[in-house]
Amino acid sequence: MGGAVSAGEDNDELIDNLKEAQYIRSELVEQAFRAIDRADYYLEEFKENAYKDLAWKHGNIHLSAPCIYSEVMEALDLQPGLSFLNLGSGTGYLSSMVGLILGPFGVNHGVELHSDVTEYAKQKLDFFIRTSDSFDKFDFCEPSFVTGNCLEISPDCSQYDRVYCGAGVQKEHEEYMKSLLKVGGILVMPLEEKLTKITRTGPSAWETKKILAVSFAPLIQPCQSESGKSRLVQLPPLAVRSLQDLARIAIRGTIKKVIHQEAVNKNGNGLKNTPRFKRRRVRRRRLETIVFLDKEVFASRISNPSDDNSSGDLEEERREEEATTPPDAKPEPPVNFLREKVLSLPLPDPLKYYLLYYREK
């Protein structure tokens, strides 16, 4: 699946393309996509394909196409403090983006069939927490991953506000998936080759909406153990945060408010995102394929005055861009204001590092 939008040269350009094509429609979803670089979840030798709107699979590792994840994130209608269950959590890319929206008082659980992929997801999560500035820009709900078949979840597990299944669900398993959902909750899953959004409006009442046609690998059926019994999957416990952890969250939140107020007093409008210098895009001739009598005829579509506001306008646009953008212009490296503020506080170093989650940068 995928290929609905043009490839980007970096993560931001990919997101720009998804916005332009209306796959990303809300600010919260856009912020989450920009905060986590899709390439970080690829193996090193395959990163050149990270910004294409294509699914990627290597062994048991799998990522859906960006346009699919965009539709899923929008359909889930995520809000801070909700509980989320990701069935087939894979690399943890989607779970981490969801965690940026859920905030510190949400619940973020994932079930993955393959133990090697669960380990891969934990490594990627650790890398994100240790190295990404986005961790300090958001209040993060850290995902917890367990290994097992998502069709064997223990029947006494808690229900969730939001559930996503990343594998094709057959009609026979629809009721099972619905049973994982709280009243008022939303379930998004590929059901009979349609990405489907199901909202639980009452104990036995549901609203169903078909979003788009998709092609997902089907759920793998459970295998019985040697004893003939299924292996029940125990989801992570719904643990209450310690007082110490709650204090850290509160202190970090207060510091962020101070930073924002200082920026308002200085600039009048708070912190601004670092400007992104976009590469100038070359206007390429688009190719249209016409299928006629089983033969493909390729017609070159060349820009003309009626198509492209005349070549004179393009030349003027080019000159203006060159005049306003220095040839060696590069965006300034982002500043982690929270980290700088914490390190400047008159506190013992161990407390500073605790407030920073012992992050490397």
UniProtKB/Swiss-Prot annotation:
Disulphide-bridged cysteine pairs: none
BP terms from Gene Ontology: protein modification process
GO molecular function, one term: protein-L-isoaspartate (D-aspartate) O-methyltransferase activity
Covalently attached lipid (N-myristoyl glycine), positions: G2
Biased composition, class Polar residues, residue ranges: 303-312
Region (AdoMet binding motif): 85-94, 160-164, 181-191
Region of interest (CUL-box), residue spans: 345-348
Region (Disordered): 303-335
InterPro entries for the chain: PCMT, SAM-dependent_MTases_sf
Subcellular locations according to the entry: Cytoplasm
Keywords, in A-Z order: Cytoplasm, Lipoprotein, Myristate
Active site: S64
PANTHER family xref list: PROTEIN-L-ISOASPARTATE O-METHYLTRANSFERASE, PROTEIN-L-ISOASPARTATE O-METHYLTRANSFERASE DOMAIN-CONTAINING PROTEIN 2
Protein's name in the database: Protein-L-isoaspartate O-methyltransferase domain-containing protein 2
Organism name: Bos taurus
Gene it is expressed from: PCMTD2
